[in-house]
A protein has these predicted regions:
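Amphipathic alpha-helical coiled-coil segments
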Residues: 1-75, 82-93
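Terminal intrinsically disordered/low-complexity segments used for targeting and assembly
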Residues: 91-102
C-alpha cells in the first residue's frame, strides 16, 4: 500500500541521515587526532633540530622528522577536507536552509 511504501522511504531516509551524522562526528574526531599528530610531529622535528645543533643527531634524522611533520600536516588537511565534505553532505541531506544560505 501507499502508506507502507511511504513509511519504508521515510525509514530509508532516516537511516541515511543518521549515517551521515555518524560520518560527520567521526570526521570531527579524525581532525582532532590528526591535529594532535601534527603537533607531536612538529615537536619531534623541533627537538631533533635542537639535538642536531648540539651535535647529538645527524642531518638524515632531522630530515626524517621534518618529513614526518609535513606528512602529518597533509593528513590533517585531508581530515579537514573530509570533515567539510561530510558536513556538507549532512546539510544537503537534511535540507538545512539556513546552513545552505537559502
Amino acid at each position: 500500500s501507499l502508506r507502507l511504501r511511504r513509511r519504508t522511504i521515510e525509514d530509508q531516509i532516516l537511516v541515511e541521515v543518521n549515517g551521515l551524522a555518524i560520518q560527520a562526528t567521526n570526521a570531527d574526531r579524525l581532525v582532532a587526532l590528526a591535529a594532535d599528530e601534527t603537533a607531536l610531529a612538529d615537536r619531534m622535528a623541533e627537538a631533533e633540530r635542537r639535538r642536531f645543533q648540539l651535535g647529538a643527531s645527524d642531518f638524515i634524522v632531522v630530515n626524517l622528522r621534518e618529513e614526518s611533520a609535513a606528512d602529518a600536516r597533509l593528513r590533517e588537511l585531508d581530515a579537514e577536507y573530509r570533515r567539510s565534505a561530510a558536513r556538507a553532505e549532512l546539510v544537503a541531506a537534511t535540507a538545512d536552509r539556513e546552513q545552505l544560505g537559502l
